[in-house]
Swiss-Prot record:
Catalytic reaction equation(s): L-histidinol phosphate + 2-oxoglutarate = 3-(imidazol-4-yl)-2-oxopropyl phosphate + L-glutamate
GO molecular function: histidinol-phosphate transaminase activity; pyridoxal phosphate binding
Pathway annotation from the record: Amino-acid biosynthesis; L-histidine biosynthesis; L-histidine from 5-phospho-alpha-D-ribose 1-diphosphate: step 7/9
Species of provenance: Haemophilus influenzae (strain 86-028NP)
Modified residues (N6-(pyridoxal phosphate)lysine): 226
Lineage: superkingdom: Bacteria
Cofactor(s) named in the record: pyridoxal 5'-phosphate
Protein name: Histidinol-phosphate aminotransferase 2
Keywords of the record: Amino-acid biosynthesis, Aminotransferase, Histidine biosynthesis, Pyridoxal phosphate, Transferase
Length: 366
């Protein structure tokens, strides 16, 4: 029996998601230690102390199911961003939410629009539900919003826009986003995926929550895996109008967020000092990456995230492999249609130093 023959039609064309290589795997493969992982856009400062304390206090309660509604976390999000708890949907990471949007609002034969070089989950979930993918060619590595509008049809149900975009780091301004939303029919859901918004400067950050008052078809998706440092716990949230949130919560799995994730999220969302430290390190170290690339005549895509994507003008796989042998893990992105590029997460100064040294050795810089 070949069970692929009885699988859902959309699933047959899928391949498993390939995550960044774990440190432990590389240690087993080549037998070295002191490995630096700059592959998955994780928080280099480690797990925040505020979250550790909150989790410790929660340990004796783990025989009980978590709060299925996430009351305390919703209250925290609502207070922080000036929204109402009934606008919030919680997810097991924002990946969970990105899939939830598609399962709630699209089905076989519907169209879902996203950009070339977009986050891999968008095409994965589109294929999984056997919807029609409309991938819009990128414009200067970023979103061609006019191309999105041109692609709209009566079958369009959902649009995904990451801002900043992963893996390219491109960024849309508030005005660009609002001009776009004003032209999208209200029966088309627009998902603004803001997984990396905390790394943008406050003066240029999009005030996306204010747009919810004007555009009822907007969903804002965020994660606590990046700036907040909770990647291993899997927690994210979406904010939308209450009717959309109600529909999402009908489809959302019960107890999709565990007790430790809910508790840690409340603690770290109130830890402004930690988030500012993370963002400041990212700003300083991003400048060092840009300087390194310019000094060594390496092309890169200017990024507003916590990563930078370098164009090596040649297949990057051998460079990636050579960096592994030097104890540095970065992210190959040939799967995104960018075989000449590597994406590097911004780490701590000493981690970035190791990358600069390793890449200089691999490329034989003076």
């Amino acid at each position: 029996m070949q069970y692929i023959n009885i699988a859902n039609r959309g699933v047959k064309s899928l391949s498993p998601y390939q995550a960044g290589k774990p440190i432990e795997e590389l240690e087993r493969e080549i037998g070295i230690s002191n490995i630096v992982k700059l592959a998955s856009n994780e928080n280099p400062f480690g797990f925040p102390e505020s979250a550790k304390k909150a989790i410790f206090e929660q340990l004796d309660k783990l025989t009980r199911y978590p709060d299925a509604n996430g009351f305390e976390l919703k209250q925290t999000i609502a207070k922080k961003f000036g929204v109402q708890p009934n606008q919030i949907t919680l997810g097991n990471g924002s990946n969970d939410l990105l899939e939830l949007f598609a399962h709630t609002f699209a089905t076989e034969g519907d169209e879902i629009i996203y950009s070339q070089y977009a986050f891999i989950v968008y095409p994965l979930v589109t294929k999984a539900i056997n919807a029609i993918a409309k991938e819009i060619p990128a414009k200067n590595w970023g979103h061609d919003l006019q191309g999105f509008l041109t692609a709209l049809s009566d079958k369009t149900k959902l649009i995904y826009i990451a801002n900043p975009n992963n893996p390219t780091g491109n960024f849309l301004t508030s005005q660009e986003i609002e001009d776009f939303l004003a032209k999208v029919p209200e029966n088309v859901i627009v998902v603004l995926d803001e997984a990396y918004t905390e790394f943008t400067r406050s003066e240029e950050r999009v005030d996306s929550f204010s747009l919810l008052k004007k555009y009822s078809n907007l969903i804002i998706s965020r994660t606590l895996s990046k700036a907040y440092g909770l990647a291993g716990l899997r927690i994210g949230y979406a904010v939308s109008n209450p009717e959309i949130a109600d529909l999402l919560n009908r489809v959302r799995q019960p107890f999709n967020c565990n007790s430790l994730a809910l508790t840690a999220a409340v603690a770290v969302m109130n830890d402004d000092e930690f988030i500012e430290k993370v963002a400041e390190n990212n700003r300083i170290e991003m400048r060092r990456y840009e300087d390194f690339c310019q000094k060594n005549q390496l092309d890169y895509i200017p990024s507003k995230g916590n990563f930078i994507t370098i164009d090596f003008k040649q297949p990057a796989a051998p460079i990636y492999d050579a960096l592994l042998r030097e104890g540095v893990i970065v992210r190959p992105i040939a799967g995104y249609g960018m075989p000449n590029h590597l994406r590097i997460s911004i780490g701590l100064p000493e981690e970035n130093d190791k990358f600069f040294t390793a890449l200089s050795k691999v490329l034989k810089f003076a």
